[in-house]
């Protein structure tokens, strides 16, 4: 009798485990986002994983019948966004950096099924500079909250450069650089974004080996969660900037000095074979540590003069094309499936340098479908530079995929500002433009976060809408 009872209990438990194992992971992860954010999973809630359509764009549907809330979504992020859209639109809750609230009535009023389809395949979040102004000293607990915030607000393509320097140091040590030479190049954590873009080196001291190891451990947790949530992280690639110590290893190295705000950096010539050697070694070492990637962010000439030939010359065009070919080779030789992501800040900010001829030359060096330009600051075109939108000025970005993005925060400032109607509806002009070209994504790239929360509620909603939003409603 005792054996029979034990066998019955074992079979019952195995059935429960088997049943749990058959649940889509997307649903389990979405439920955990809600529990972590609001402290509980509403009894009235049911998630349903839907089949995505051929467009590659996510969608969700919301309905309430007999008091039961049903959220259908094509991905984990779509499920989270669907739930958050419902509670926010009904006034039942909010999730932001100041705090979270969820207060559902005992019985939810019935709601006719409402479908929301995003017009974009990607929903980008963060800026290279966010990792200097806001996040450099975040721990896992803080990152976990931000990842949940991203999912609820519908962002599925976050930047993920944490531990870049730890991996880069490995590559350079293998090449023969001393730790002293590497440390002389590295900045402190808060200045690393500008080091990655070739703007500065050496400022504020190099981090310790213990700090690097901590960043590697942190990045493993960040990426594990991003992947569990179905996100598409943007890793860092190699833009060609190297320590001064490289001259000792390779006296014949072809280096150009670049200058930014009183700082100088060394840029490898795209004709030098060691450019691809270093870049591909970095990608291999990165993927050996963190697994396969697809999207690699490489920022070239950010707020820098182009050090190749005269503006408008064939020499400049040819060298820019060669530079792009070299960057892409440094990615593709290590990972043939890699896509180069490029922040297009300089295309709007420095049009005296980046004329259409130069931009077309740069972009033409990479096959279509293998380079995606982030049109970083569309709001600056309209309200700061008073200039033509890049998708028009550069003829649809010459056939390259691109992402519409805004910079609602500059320099980590905390002023309560923002043109809400533009953030809600500005992307509709891009979607309707005859020069929209290969517009595949929508995003926001604040230099600092944890501020101005109302703006981000509007921005995140806009990324899932192809219709005009009335911000006063």
Regions found by a protein language model. Name each.
Residues 4-13:
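Sec-dependent N-terminal signal peptides
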Residues 20-120:
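Contiguous, structured surface segment used for ligand recognition
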Residues 16-20, 470-473:
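Short, intrinsically disordered, charge-balanced linker/junction segments flanking boundaries
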Residues 26, 30, 79, 83, ...:
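Stable alpha-helical elements in mature extracytoplasmic
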Residues 81-82, 120-161:
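N-terminal structural segment of carbohydrate-active enzymes
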